[in-house]
Amino acid sequence: MDYGKYGLKAYGALPNKKQMEWFRRGRSIFFHFGMNTFTDKEWGDGTESPEMFNPTDCDVDSWVKSIFEAGFELAILTAKHHDGFCLWQTKYTEHSIKNSPYKNGKGDIVREFTDACKKYGVKAGIYLSPWDRHEKTWGTPEYNDFYVGQLTELLTNYGEIWECWWDGAGSTEAVYDWERWARTVHALAPNAVIFGSLGATPWVDVRWVGNEKGIAGEPCYATIDASSLVYEYTTELNSGKAGGERFIPAEADVSIRPGWFYHESQDNLVRTPENLMELYLASVGRGGGMLLNIPPSRRGRLEENDVRSILTFNEMLQKAFASNLLDGAAVEASTQAKGAPSILNGGFFAPEENDKSPTLTIKLPQKTKINTIMLGEAIELGQKITSVRVCAYVNGEKTELFTAKSVGYKLIKRFDSVTADEIIIEISGSLDAPVLDKIGAYLINDIKNEQEKCAKISASTKITDNVAEIELGGIFTFDTVSADWFTEQGYKIYLFNGTEYDLVKEGNVRGYFRVRLDNPSDGAYRLKIEFEKDVPKDVDFILS
């Protein structure tokens, strides 16, 4: 749309073409597959033998076929996780698939992945962990040569790459040349968005949402100040900032299971299609993107439960938004840019500059039952709206349906069903003249949220003398550690931050062991409890 010919101007930080394509996709897939799949851990330490990697029935083509059939247009593969084990034939390390039994050392999972993406028309993305716990040069300036070498292999030998995903694990302790890495991506994969934060902030296109639960904030502005990424302020990452200095939308990452890697113990803890629908509304429906992880098993296959869930989720999604109930409605605007086509006919709603409280009224041809409204700004002109109220006339009375502090590329709000013949959108706050280019009303079947099923904590415990180490099978929120164990002694509880243990609680217990942490943990994969006396081998610790 050429908004300039209607006298409309852009405001503030603006999206680039890559970000607009990212918005259009809406939802993407993550495949966590690697050494951790075979060690039953979430984070490896780099000491694992390559011989442990041996999928017995690997079919990467079927992974991509499944997610293509479920409507996903982009998938990211963990080419290398923190343990440093590489899923391609890299020349920079022996800690790779070339020294595994898989296809007698001739296999290349990255090749199989990118070939399948080309076959099904799915865009390929790469996760190359900045942190490498196996590589001896990690933490030194020399590691940058090593990393750029591997990055170059991935970006030149496997076709076009559309997303490069960098997380911050281990990044505060290393000397990374983020600019050099980013310039490598820009040169070799010019259409790829870069996901990242910390030192990579000047070059990133997409930001972390501040949690690994797949939930964006309310509001969730695509604009944000750079400092929020540099220091990973999770509250700001989740909500963004109206009028922020950078345009960096939020990607909400979440796993279909409690863990990011496959654990057989979690086969019955797969998120339901209903829960995936809720997460879609809490990410894409709040102006962000959805990044859903599906971990292949030790066989090298996606499990049936996982595939069934995403296929049903896609069916629900397509059905929910198949019919815009505003079709055939009449539109009245308080004011409208001269010559602008109607928003219900492929146009937009842009009030005149002097209209400080613009209102859009939609008169339905008949009384219609609705429970969902979708709005969207012409985001290429900037994210402007900071306050909107949507009402409907129900039985002749004006009834508020919802209010919101941001709209962005897409806002989807559900509410209790009403039967209305008129819908009113009132924009009461905007940084500049607002422009809406999307509006829809829908009746979505009730969604029974079964997320509680997925919140159960799976963990394995190793007890050595007076120390209990608990390895979590994913990221969980918990604030209480307990055990059906009567004891009288002192204790210290530590949470693993990725590189070392942090002391979070100490004290004495007399009676059954039950300790409440001062602050909930929602990002640790591992914890350790040190006691004054030895711990019985059969003690079962419970996190809640």
Q: How should each PLM-predicted stretch be described?
A:
Residues 305-312, 320-323, 347-402, 406-456, ...:
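Aromatic, loop-rich ligand-recognition surfaces of beta-strand-rich domains
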Residues 1-385, 392, 402-405, 409-414, ...:
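Mature catalytic domains of secreted/periplasmic carbohydrate-active enzymes
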